[in-house]
């Protein structure tokens, strides 16, 4: 039993020694990566997400709140993502808002939990200036580089409309650099009006992929799905590139093992190169001794003591390696020594260099998660049966059935040979029962000499019992051997019994030589023949050695560079335990002086059996050089060791040969085995359509709906004339709308063609005519002829344009405003000396472009307007109006003061000036304010903006709202000029005709809503009119005399009606009958009587039409189809056809 315990401990000792020596891991194969599956670093994927919010002026209040709500919803969805493998997500979130500046709140370094993150995002305030996406991307990249975790997944989610400030740098290069650093971008558009090309440029998405929009109700789910795929792909890639962690702390030192099995005796070493020492100095001549009688020849004596080693000679050339000798027989076991004291544990050694990283096999698939809890039952729905649902989850596999009972059937016939099956999958290695000990195999070939370092001296084992004394040897004396190297002093042998031989001649005394260098330990010589037993000598005193001093603690070595993980090598075969070698006998503690070499004595009598010596542990000797590798010993007897750990599954073997043999008899039914693994996923068929569910309870009433005022309905049919009422008493009411156009009169019959007259004689050339009349002179002439009222009085005017140049306007719309201001100034201010104009350009700051005293000509005014710079920041309307109030302090006394505000957004909340206070100051200074608001009715901020427009304007009739900047038409200019110069402009409208505008929204009938027109086209002549054309707009054209003519709409009458007006200052006169043409007058072509109809298509071309009210031809834009016949290709054709002479 004791031998089994010793063998078991000896087998465990190499396993412990290969892993740790005094707390230090030895070199060897590194642990498999699969063994570290539960390691923290390998089980977590780090994810850093930065939300980038557009806080510019174009995002306004509602869009900025929508962005914060989106971040709140998506951040919660991100934490609901679960990895598909045995991993965990470690997620950190940060938020960044940008405009012309960037604010990071919160950063990644201050991440605590999701609740704190949501609170800080909700507290963000709108910056409200220009859009600079470049700085947002650069700051997000710097944030992820500095505070993002190494080897983590980095994602930036950018929300913007992609319409940057003109001074914003290009984002292409910085976006590409960020993606090279491993940052993934996801872009979201704020509205349907986005720059899709720029958003794709930032995210790197292909052109065929649609752009994500913030208004999409499924946006959160779409981005959650996209992030889930991104995280799974990135984290799986990171796991494959995992690195070895830091080495752990050294473990506690192991217990000392039992002494190993006695090893075999090694082969005899080659004799060393003995060199003869130098001859010593001649000593003094001794006294001649007494010459004795010659004795008998004695027996061969024992070999003499080993002589002193001579001085070390030079190293000779390295000789060839000798042939491996045959191992000698095992020696007798030595006496068992006493158990020594346990030594102190040595200091931990330095860490060894890390090995190359290994590549582990794929881990086992994780278990399926638990099923979620059942939600609360919802209300019973009402509706038709829906489409068949998707296939349900796969069911759990059923248990294996009980084995059937029955008698074994007869042996079946041998079936036909089937085809060779495919190579099977790699099987799982299952440790089987330990097999029986096999027969002892033949001795294997000699292994390659091992390379190892000298180990420390082991603890001396217990002294074994003395072996039996061998029989005396017999043999003839051999030749005298060469003088060998001096060996260690052996024990003093017993005194021999024999005839004293003759005394030898004394040798010359040599000079003492230099002490030689301690020689190498010689190999053990062959066991000599037993000498004659001598007399027992005196028993010496037992020596006791002192323990040597404790060695100095070595310095801790520096940590080696991390090496690459190597491929694990194949597991080698288990070695056989060696045979325990004999323990040497301790020598005497005091060596005696060497006596003279005596003659060989005769054979002595066998001595008595000696007592066992006391084992005394001597001091630790110096470490000797490495000896030659011994031959492998014979396989020793022993008990089979403990089964080793389960090895890795080997590669699948080659496909076996097709078996040939008869079918065996059917075996008896085996014992019922455990239930098998789950089978493959089944393929089900779609079930039948379910029955219609029961009618559910009625739902709660919905919230009240919101809607805008509908468009004005069509005019109803004319009612029957009522009886004439009594004359009422009251004040005169407002002027009514234009009535409907009457029915077109019956076309007269064409008269017969008269006889052609005789051609007259060509007359003489008349004198040169007078200079033609100007536009103003023609208007004055018409007024004098028609007698329709006084001409417009040019009233002195102080006009200040307050122009919004904020970020939401945009550079293109700002150019439209510039053109609009120049055109409006031409209509209003015929003389800059009478009507003076000032300009204020504002955004987050206010620029006084021109004062009221600056301009002397319209060319200077237009040049200043063209040189205005687009600011593109916030909307500080209150500060701009305050600057207008300061400018009006330079106004002339008693002159009308008008401010025209053109804006597209509500005032910035950070404006230091209060809008209500500034407007009150303007009203107190008798400043009349008009407002042109450009905003769509479906805009979320329309109600707020509309209230602000009414607050700014002097009264509700001074507010004009348009959907966009393209709808600033001349009709608006007329309404403004009616307020400024009422008589003159109203006269122009009544003389040339004006379409009736239907207000679609608002507080007053003065508000105008016009849709976007067709692109404008320019006319080539000395006077150009550039404008669009559609059903709701007018076309101003030039007559041959240069008069600006307005085409008569289809609703206008064909006759010149008397001009009636209820306005003050306008006198009513009767038209001059001499200038009126008779309605019964016939034209050469019936097309001349048709009203002008531009048509309904979009292919506009220039044509000429005849206006019978002024008996003149003019140009107009013809749409290309469905127009009236009153159109001609040239002015000449129109004149020849229609104009009456």
From Swiss-Prot:
Residues 242-770 are annotated as: Disordered. Residues 291-311, 735-753 have a biased composition (Basic and acidic residues). The keyword Ion transport does not apply. GO terms for cellular component: basement membrane; collagen trimer; collagen-containing extracellular matrix; extracellular region. Keywords: Basement membrane, Cell adhesion, Collagen, Disulfide bond, Extracellular matrix, Protease inhibitor, Repeat, Secreted, Serine protease inhibitor, Signal. Residues 1088-1138 form the BPTI/Kunitz inhibitor domain. It comes from the Eukaryota. Residues 345-356 have a biased composition (Pro residues). One of its GO terms (biological process) is cell adhesion. Residues 335-344 have a biased composition (Low complexity). Residues 48-227, 798-976 form the VWFA domain. It is found in: Secreted, Extracellular space, Extracellular matrix, Basement membrane. SUPFAM superfamilies: BPTI-like, vWA-like. Expressed in skin, intestine, sternum, brain and kidney. Lower expression is also observed in heart, lung, sciatic nerve, dorsal root ganglia, peripheral nerves and calvaria of newborn mice and in intestine and brain of adult mice. Found in basement membrane surrounding a particular subset of Schwann cells in adult sciatic nerve. Residues 243-300, 301-358, 501-544, 545-588, 733-769 form the Collagen-like domain. Residues 1-20 form the signal peptide. SMART domains: KU, VWA. Disulfide bonds join 1088-1138, 1097-1121, 1113-1134. PROSITE patterns: BPTI_KUNITZ_1 (PS00280), BPTI_KUNITZ_2 (PS50279), VWFA (PS50234). InterPro entries: Collagen_superfamily, Kunitz_BPTI, Kunitz_BPTI_sf, Prtase_inh_Kunz-CS, VWF_A, vWFA_dom_sf. The keyword Disulfide bond applies. One of its GO terms (molecular function) is serine-type endopeptidase inhibitor activity. Belongs to the VWA-containing collagen family. May act as a cell-binding protein. Trimer or homomer. Secreted into as a 135 kDa monomer under reducing conditions and as a homotrimer under non-reducing conditions. This is Collagen alpha-1(XXVIII) chain. The gene is Col28a1.
